[in-house]
Amino acid sequence: MVKVKICGLRRKEDIEYANELKPDYVGFVFAKSKRQIEVEQALDLISLLDKEIKTVGVFVNEPVENALKIAQTLNLDVLQFHGDETQDYIDNFKNFTVWKAIRIKDKEDLEKTKEFKVNSFVFDTLTKNEYGGTGKTFNWEVLKGFELNVPIILAGGLNENNVEEAIRIVNPYAVDVSSGVETEGYKDFKKMKSFIEKVRGIR
């Protein structure tokens, strides 16, 4: 079954929604964005989170020391690097599960995967001056038949109306959603529920 990651949790209500709906992963964004969260706030929220749900910290070009400190303080399960990080940078996180985001415009962008040794790749939409969470999709067909020796996580503009088609085309390990389960910038329980049900209903 395809796994689900809900990204950009910021409120206690978001944690309550997650505890009821049980996505496989939840993401906390430490990069400058409208979904950015402070470490202390994340610590409080994680203490309320169902222990079966894995935690993902999302970083964009964060200094190594800061990212390590946050990861250790929060005991994060996964570190997702969504910026211009290199393999040399990622080598500082050998004790962690690491996902690297690759922003996709066309098939040539898939070549970037050869530069990294990580646990998974997150394929997101290439948007100028933005690092994810834009609500825009890319052409999933570029991933059709593309094989890696690590799992593929699909992100970028997913929502309850398109996730089934996206999974059919890409057959990812997991799907990653943020704006697609929001209303006016906040997580929406009904949209989260519908999204997760759509994913888990696929056979």
Curated annotation (Swiss-Prot):
Keywords: Amino-acid biosynthesis, Aromatic amino acid biosynthesis, Isomerase, Tryptophan biosynthesis. It catalyses: N-(5-phospho-beta-D-ribosyl)anthranilate = 1-(2-carboxyphenylamino)-1-deoxy-D-ribulose 5-phosphate. Disulfide bonds: none annotated. Transmembrane segments: none annotated. InterPro entries: Aldolase_TIM, PRAI_dom, RibuloseP-bd_barrel, TrpF_fam. Its EC number is 5.3.1.24. The keyword Amino-acid biosynthesis applies. Pathway: Amino-acid biosynthesis; L-tryptophan biosynthesis; L-tryptophan from chorismate: step 3/5. GO terms for molecular function: phosphoribosylanthranilate isomerase activity. The keyword Cell membrane does not apply. Gene3D superfamilies: Aldolase class I. GO terms for biological process: L-tryptophan biosynthetic process. CDD domains: PRAI (cd00405). Belongs to the TrpF family. This is N-(5'-phosphoribosyl)anthranilate isomerase.
